[in-house]
Amino acid sequence: MTDLTRVATDLRCDILRMIAEAKSGHPGGSLSCADILTSLYFGGVLKHDPKNPKMEGRDWFFLAKGHAAPALYAALAHAGYFPVEELMTLRKLGTRLQGHPDCNLCPGVEVSTGSLGQGLSIAAGTACGLALDGKEGSVFALLGDGECEEGQVWEAAMFSAHRKLDNLTAIIDHNGLQIDGKVTEVCSPEDLGVKFEAFGWDVRHVNGHDIDALIEVLNACKSSRDGKPHAVIAETVKGKGVSFMENEAGWHGKAPSAEQLEAALAELEAACDEEVCRG
């Protein structure tokens, strides 16, 4: 897992670099989902082709929590969809890398997202269309736990179970924080695993920073065709990897200063080196 640890660290470093360069963005929730994206794009879970993003039979990924676009852009760049150097154009005039993903501009982005609550509906519609057409391909959507306060999420959950969309997996980035503070204090969705089960979903829980475990559970969901959509509750830490950002709601949407960036990058590299030595 040493190589994927390196990839996840590279994603986190680039997330911070591009947000610092743009002086705007969402580091907390981007850092919390970096290991999930590493597992999907580099762990052999997603069937995809950077040279042919619209390949027939591909798997589909939707970033429902579109404000974490820096994490998706970093993953796509390192996977080969566009040059890594382009990451530094985040949020700049004329860039393909908008503050939230734009499918008309950025290769590898399946749909424009950022309006919270809509991503799972789009994923469910895609999964339903694939099933009706008898086409290959699994569909994955990454949601925030704060996003699950949106009622549309539960309409999509009900529809997905009713249509037996077992080609659909919803991954919940369960970091416990949103822009205004703790999810449980803003508008608690209660136990999300119990809730998805009540809607007729197959539910699995995983450490959202354990890449081996993530790959195992995501592949298990992908291979399971038992008539139920799949929900993966990934326990994560907002701002993961940077001690002064971890579990701090204030880092939901704030760019680091030059000094903070330097400290964060040094901490991430030191942790990666330690992990490699242990491995």
Name each model feature, range by range:
Residues 1-69:
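N-terminal amphipathic, basic-rich helices that act as targeting or association modules
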Residues 1-4, 8, 12, 29-34, ...:
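Generic structural signal for well-ordered, non-membrane alpha-helical segments
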Residues 19-23, 76, 200-203:
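Short amphipathic alpha-helical interaction patches enriched in hydrophobic/aromatic residues
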Residues 34-39, 70-74, 121-128:
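Contiguous, well-ordered alpha-helical segments that form the cores/surfaces of helical PPI scaffolds
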Residues 39-44, 78-79, 159:
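Active-site catalytic microenvironments for nucleophilic, acid-base chemistry
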Residues 47-54, 58-60, 100-279:
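Glycine-rich ThDP/TPP pyrophosphate-binding loop and its adjacent helix/strand module
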Residues 73-82:
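Alpha-helical support elements that line or immediately flank enzyme active sites
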Residues 83-102:
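Anionic-ligand anchoring segments at beta-strand to alpha-helix junctions in alpha/beta enzyme folds, i.e.
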